[in-house]
Amino acid sequence: MRHEHLAPGAMVLRQFAAPEGAALLAGIEGVTVHAPFRHMITPGGFRMSVGMTNCGPLGWVTDKTGYRYDAVDPVSGLPWPPMPDVFRRLATGAAANAGFNEYVPDACLVNRYEPGSRLTLHQDRNEKDFDQPIISVSLGLPAVFLFGGFERSDRAARVEVTHGDVVVWGGPSRLRYHGVLPLKEGRHPLVGVYRINLTFRKAG
């Protein structure tokens, strides 16, 4: 495994999740049986291009009333599915490898990208504790991850992430802007025409 430094408190752990790829995909399949992917609506009324769902005690949601974490899936009215053990172990291990010990996530946002799907530059500000890092796991098709500064207008580094790569950012880099360029077409032997991203956070 290779560590690639991005900024103070931020790095890419190349291929860190690759050995658990099949188990992670099985976990995602189990989660989506109970909480299928959906395209959420932003407060401005726009439909997000990325399909989303959640697992764990808290789930990130957006609708016309705003962005927030909720213990209940607004589609089913039921609690989000439990976070699979393999998810939690991976997130905790990645955090420790990046120097963030005793990290225990309580939210996992599962994003499914189709060709053309993107995520515009944004900060993660809905969490209660900014001392806890963000863990981002890439599965499936490669993508270009944007890692910017502390203003939306700051120049963003373009970082290619492939199946099994994990990006960790926290500490002085916790509130940096980040996003994903539109996904290019392709086919991955395990994930097909999609890229799936797991984003772990300590939200509550």
Regions found by a protein language model. Name each.
Residues 1-204:
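Non-heme Fe(II) oxygenase metal-center motifs and adjacent flexible, charged/small-residue loops
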